[in-house]
Curated annotation (Swiss-Prot):
<dbReference type="GO" id="GO:0008380">
    <property type="term" value="P:RNA splicing"/>
</dbReference>
<dbReference type="GO" id="GO:0005730">
    <property type="term" value="C:nucleolus"/>
</dbReference>
<feature type="region of interest" description="Interaction with SAFB1">
    <location>
        <begin position="189"/>
        <end position="201"/>
    </location>
</feature>
<dbReference type="InterPro" id="IPR034503">
    <property type="entry name" value="SRSF9_RRM1"/>
</dbReference>
<feature type="modified residue" description="Phosphoserine">
    <location>
        <position position="196"/>
    </location>
</feature>
<feature type="cross-link" description="Glycyl lysine isopeptide (Lys-Gly) (interchain with G-Cter in SUMO2)">
    <location>
        <position position="37"/>
    </location>
</feature>
<feature type="region of interest" description="Disordered">
    <location>
        <begin position="190"/>
        <end position="222"/>
    </location>
</feature>
<feature type="modified residue" description="Phosphoserine">
    <location>
        <position position="217"/>
    </location>
</feature>
<feature type="modified residue" description="Phosphotyrosine">
    <location>
        <position position="193"/>
    </location>
</feature>
<feature type="modified residue" description="Phosphoserine">
    <location>
        <position position="194"/>
    </location>
</feature>
<dbReference type="GO" id="GO:0048025">
    <property type="term" value="P:negative regulation of mRNA splicing, via spliceosome"/>
</dbReference>
<feature type="modified residue" description="Phosphotyrosine">
    <location>
        <position position="215"/>
    </location>
</feature>
<keyword id="KW-1017">Isopeptide bond</keyword>
<keyword id="KW-0597">Phosphoprotein</keyword>
<dbReference type="InterPro" id="IPR050374">
    <property type="entry name" value="RRT5_SRSF_SR"/>
</dbReference>
<comment type="function">
    <text>Plays a role in constitutive splicing and can modulate the selection of alternative splice sites. Represses the splicing of MAPT/Tau exon 10.</text>
</comment>
<dbReference type="InterPro" id="IPR000504">
    <property type="entry name" value="RRM_dom"/>
</dbReference>
């Protein structure tokens, strides 16, 4: 699912990182203080748009310093906010779908799968993973542009907990958009998902991803 700033994001070889979930009063100097110890900073771009959660791009002279910054600051508690720090993913193709998650090849897939509907326009796979891992370890997450998402859990009991406890819960994207989402089993077509205009049948799931899937190793912190 693309966001309002998807066209500003680049690849990971230029030393640039994305910093999200920043406090509303953040300044460029604050970002410099957060990241200077990882290496020489070439540029800081702070995006503080009215009514949205601020985010920024920080560019290091050495791409290896960018990797260190991600390792050291992703998930870091900064004031009342937990930072999200990652490489900007390259967007391309019609519709702006992401290509090439940094997490590498599939580490594990699971049959313990749920579908999610009602995601806000700026909701990303990372937002979905963060929300749904309240039920347990997520090994796969993906989204598409019509507000649908798919999540796979490592354990059946976590999937069952998500179906019971995360259905009709308030979801918040990295840009501050909120909505109440529905969570249901993959083979269900509940909650108004409409079939394509072609009238095609025979699919086990109403979900069809148009972008690269995103895998998560249960042995790495996110």
């Amino acid at each position: 699912m693309s966001s309002g700033w998807a066209d500003e994001r680049g690849g990971e070889g230029d030393g640039r990182i994305y910093v999200g979930n920043l406090p509303s009063d953040v300044r460029e100097k604050d970002l410099e203080d957060l990241f200077y110890k990882y290496g020489r900073i070439r540029e800081i771009e702070l995006k503080n748009r009215h009514g949205l959660v601020p985010f920024a791009f920080v560019r290091f002279e050495d791409p290896r310093d960018a990797e260190d910054a991600i390792y050291g600051r992703n998930g870091y508690d900064y004031g009342q906010c937990r930072l999200r720090v990652e490489f900007p993913r390259t967007y391309g193709g019609r519709g702006g779908w992401p290509r090439g998650a940094r997490n590498g090849p599939p580490t594990r897939r699971s049959d313990f799968r749920v579908l999610v509907s009602g995601l806000p326009p700026s909701g990303s796979w990372q937002d979905l993973k963060d929300h749904m891992r309240e039920a347990g370890d997520v090994c796969y997450a993906d989204v598409q542009k019509d507000g649908m998402g798919m999540v796979e859990y490592l354990r059946k009991e976590d999937m069952e907990y998500a179906l019971r406890k995360l259905d009709d819960t308030k979801f918040r994207s990295h840009e501050g958009e909120t909505s109440y989402i529905r969570v249901y089993p993959e083979r269900s077509t509940s909650y108004g998902y409409s079939r394509s205009r072609s009238g095609s049948r025979g699919r086990d799931s109403p979900y069809q991803s148009r972008g690269s899937p995103h895998y998560f190793s249960p042995f790495r912190p996110y």
